[in-house]
A protein has these predicted regions:
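Active-site/ligand-binding loops adjacent to catalytic centers
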Residues: 54-83, 105, 130-133, 138-229, ...
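Phosphate/pyrophosphate-binding loops at sites that engage ATP/ADP/AMP, CoA/4′-phosphopantetheine
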Residues: 97-106
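Single conserved hydrophobic/aromatic residue that forms the stacking wall/gate
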Residues: 1-12
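Short glycine/serine/threonine-rich phosphate/pyrophosphate-binding segments
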Residues: 6, 24-26, 114-125, 146-147, ...
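Glycine/aspartate-rich loop-and-adjacent alpha/beta segment that forms the canonical ThDP
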Residues: 83-90, 249, 257-279
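Buried hydrophobic positions in well-ordered alpha/beta secondary-structure cores of metabolic enzymes
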Residues: 33, 95, 111-112, 118, ...
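A glycine-rich helix N-cap at a beta->alpha junction
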Residues: 13-48
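Glycine-rich beta-alpha junction loops
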Residues: 22, 47, 74-77, 115-119, ...
Length: 279
């Protein structure tokens, strides 16, 4: 990614739209993008998060025919959700390859991935969608609780609607407007969901677990203590499914760790779970 980014910089100007709040929450990632030559433009409207960044990026794209629109999430108008899902499918391709080497079988019993807009889960699930023996579990962000009013559990409490050019599931207020999402995780606080995941959930092919901030934080410290791996806060939502679900001792469960947690250290160290870990 980095070498491609540098190469493109010789030909194209790169402008990255990012929610102003998310810039604060993901400062290390922002600094990396700047070092690679990108101009990071804060989205200052609305909740100042992913939803608003997509709004402003789409607006900039439509205003100038010389602009080329890229998005890393499986949301927006066709063909973007399908393109992103296919590009991300290298994840499930790699899962199959590694499982074959380690277990002699390509398919696990379960694949678990966190779910915001949907790129990570789309990639982890892609080559297993037509494998009915493989259970697909998406961990979406419940924030402070599904019924708290501060949540991003779109598939749990959302309804059908149109957002960013696609018909999908989204959270709405009493007037039918898009409702502001909340999650401690910057990558999961999106009020909608990719259309692929809306379809998988509606048809029953994908199961959904709503994971709170605290459950994700607890899972992050568990993995850090047990394996010495500090996961991204987004990935920690998927890890939390281990305690929320009952798995058999012989089940092969693949949990996709979508990123590292250095960007989330402030949230980790300020949480109540850090007290025991630091003593």
């Amino acid at each position: 990614d980095r070498s491609v980014s540098r190469g493109l910089g010789d030909v194209y100007k790169r402008q990255v739209y990012m929610g102003e709040l998310d810039i604060q929450r993901q400062r290390p990632n922002v600094e990396r993008m700047k070092m690679l030559g990108a101009k990071v433009i804060p989205a200052t409207s609305g909740s100042k998060t992913l939803n608003d960044a997509v709004n402003e990026a789409l607006e900039a794209w439509m205003k100038d025919p010389e602009n080329f629109y890229l998005i890393g999430s499986a949301v927006g108008p066709q063909p973007y959700p399908e393109m992103v899902s296919r590009f991300q499918s290298v994840i499930s391709e790699e899962i199959k390859k590694q499982l074959k080497e380690k277990t002699g079988k390509e398919n696990p019993d379960y694949v678990v991935a966190c779910l915001g807009g949907g790129s990570n889960a789309a990639g982890a699930f892609y080559h297993f969608i037509n494998e009915p023996s493989v259970h697909l579990i998406a961990a979406e962000a419940a924030g402070k609780g599904v019924d708290s009013g501060e949540t991003a559990a779109t598939l749990t409490i959302g309804e059908k609607g149109i957002l960013h050019g696609s018909q999908t599931m989204l959270m709405k207020d009493e007037q039918g407007n898009v409702k502001e999402a909340y999650s401690l995780s910057a990558g999961l606080d999106y009020p909608g969901i990719g259309p692929l995941h809306a379809h998988l959930a509606k048809t029953g092919r994908m199961e959904v677990e709503a994971v709170t901030d605290d459950e994700a934080l607890k899972a992050a410290f568990m993995l850090t203590r047990e394996e010495g791996i500090i996961p991204a806060l987004e990935s920690s939502h998927a890890l939390a499914v281990l305690e929320k679900r009952k798995f058999g001792k012989d089940d092969v469960v693949v949990i996709n760790i979508s990123g590292r947690g250095d960007k989330d250290l402030d949230n980790y160290l300020s949480s109540s779970f850090a007290q025991g870990a630091l003593e």
